[in-house]
């Protein structure tokens, strides 16, 4: 994978998750630029964290699909690929948006 294809800008990740919230209603919202989980029942967030923890602890599991995200484990980071755009009819061509995020940063998000 070419490192130039990976967007390491945190704002781009926030934008992608904001897009998912608007289009798919998965419960992400933002407070002063920080990612928060806005749903009262955070069972979905716990499942997502379970997926991330399974990725971290497993030597064999390197990639999973969750909701409309593909999550790939790297050394100390996760590569999140937003798959939602492939189902959006507004786009004539599928777009896969890649966002690199540190595992510690992801698990530290308030919820």
Curated annotation (Swiss-Prot):
This is Non-virion protein. Plays an essential role for the viral pathogenicity. The gene is NV. Pfam families: Rhabdo_NV. It comes from the Viruses. Belongs to the novirhabdovirus NV protein family.
């Amino acid at each position: 994978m070419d490192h130039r294809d990976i967007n390491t800008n945190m704002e781009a990740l926030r934008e992608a998750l904001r897009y998912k919230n608007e289009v798919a209603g998965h419960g992400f919202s933002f407070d002063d630029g920080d990612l928060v989980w806005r749903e009262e029942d955070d069972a979905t967030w716990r499942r997502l964290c379970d997926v991330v923890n399974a990725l971290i602890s497993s030597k064999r599991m390197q990639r999973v699909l969750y909701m409309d995200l593909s999550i790939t484990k790297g050394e100390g980071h996760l590569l999140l690929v937003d798959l939602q755009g492939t189902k959006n009819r507004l786009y004539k061509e599928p777009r896969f948006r890649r966002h690199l995020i540190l595992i510690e940063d992801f698990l530290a998000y308030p919820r």
